[in-house]
Amino acid sequence: KILETVREGVTGYDIEEFFHGIYNSITESAHVFYLASEGDYKKRTIKLIEILSEWTPHNYLISSPKGVDNATEKDLLVEFVEDPLFSAWEYIIPLQVVACMAPQDLGINPDIPKDPNFHRRIGSKNMENMNNPYGVEDEKVNSI
């Protein structure tokens, strides 16, 4: 959802996959969100933040407070339930908030598509019975 609303490339990695070489892509402009649920990898995630903080100032930890000794103003510490079957749902909610708030801060209106005629041009949606919600008049597009 963040990719759609912020309109920048976004991807997620398991921490072990990240260790295999993804870390090489981190630059000063990278924004890294860490989901540190309880378990074996939480300590390693915190250590990873220490290391990557040398490369980018944009590190955001989402976690329960247990085991987080040096929280920053960029961290979101929440008393999650941390149930192994439920925690995936808990950690989705903060990312949904980021997806909602970030475009506002960046001056992006996600309700306005980059190309209002994209689906007509590519033929990805049946547009025959739809109104033209953006009021776009384009003979080439409307003739598809």
Language-model region placement:
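A SIS-like phosphosugar-recognition module
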Residues: 1-144
